[in-house]
């Protein structure tokens, strides 16, 4: 139970005190009914990272609701390790696929979920959660649905250390940005690979300029 309370607290630290965290009264039955709540811990027992998922209605599919790492522990691969642990646990318990939603304007999401983990996205949801609080406030909550085929050659390769793609120099640019402001879109591209420019730090942008954050959201949604 103490770990579940710690899991509540880490959400408030990561997403902001104004958010409504998943509570221990949810975590505990989810854990008993086929879900997974797992943490990363410091040597003194402090929880520094968290991952949480639950079974989907579709057989053999897990939905991963969140992964979080305390700010002072980021850029050390902890979130990546939690996802690989989640994959191992899921495969051991009969799950072959995992899904979760990601903010398409957060560069760190693409780095972890697509490049490092080998996930793919085919579905775009507009304002998926409605208005949000904390670090997610300031713009509509558009999300990509990320699909993780945990037994695919792509994902197995990432798990075994195959280097992720490092760039697409021949890709066409779908939008233009001037001084941090999106200006033009090209919706007629037929290139096999297309690049979309996004902010380096959308969370910081939304905290400082909600109007510009909203402009970015509507621009990339288009």
Please describe what each predicted stretch is.
Residues 1-71, 103, 125:
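A conserved beta-strand-loop-helix scaffold within acyl/acetyltransferase catalytic domains
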Residues 73, 77-85:
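Conserved acetyl-CoA pyrophosphate-binding loop and the N-cap/start of the following alpha-helix
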Residues 86, 110:
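Aromatic/hydrophobic pocket-lining residues that form π-stacking "cages" and hydrophobic walls in ligand
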Residues 90-103:
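Conserved GNAT acetyl-CoA-binding A-motif
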Residues 93-95, 112, 122-222:
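Intrinsically disordered, low-complexity, positively biased terminal segments
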Residues 118-119:
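Conserved Class I S-adenosyl-L-methionine
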């Amino acid at each position: 139970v103490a770990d579940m309370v710690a899991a509540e607290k880490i959400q408030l630290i990561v997403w902001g005190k104004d958010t409504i965290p998943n509570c221990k009264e949810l975590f505990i039955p989810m854990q008993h009914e086929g879900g997974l709540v797992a943490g990363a811990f410091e040597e003194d027992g402090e929880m520094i990272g968290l991952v949480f998922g639950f079974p989907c209605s579709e057989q053999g599919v897990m939905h991963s609701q969140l992964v979080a790492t305390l700010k002072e522990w980021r850029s050390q691969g902890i979130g990546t390790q939690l996802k690989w642990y989640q994959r191992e646990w899921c495969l051991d318990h009969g799950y072959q696929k995992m899904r979760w939603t990601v903010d398409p304007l957060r560069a760190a999401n693409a780095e972890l979920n697509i490049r490092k983990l080998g996930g793919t996205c085919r579905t775009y949801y507009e304002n998926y959660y409605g208005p949000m609080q904390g670090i997610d406030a300031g713009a509509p909550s558009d999300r990509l649905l990320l699909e993780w085929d945990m037994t695919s050659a792509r994902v197995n390769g990432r798990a075994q250390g195959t280097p992720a793609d490092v760039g697409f120099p021949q890709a066409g640019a779908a939008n233009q940005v001037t001084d941090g402001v999106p200006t033009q879109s090209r919706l007629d591209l037929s290139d096999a690979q297309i690049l979309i420019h996004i902010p380096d730090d959308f969370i910081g942008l939304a905290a400082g300029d909600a109007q510009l954050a909203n402009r970015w959201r509507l621009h990339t949604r288009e």
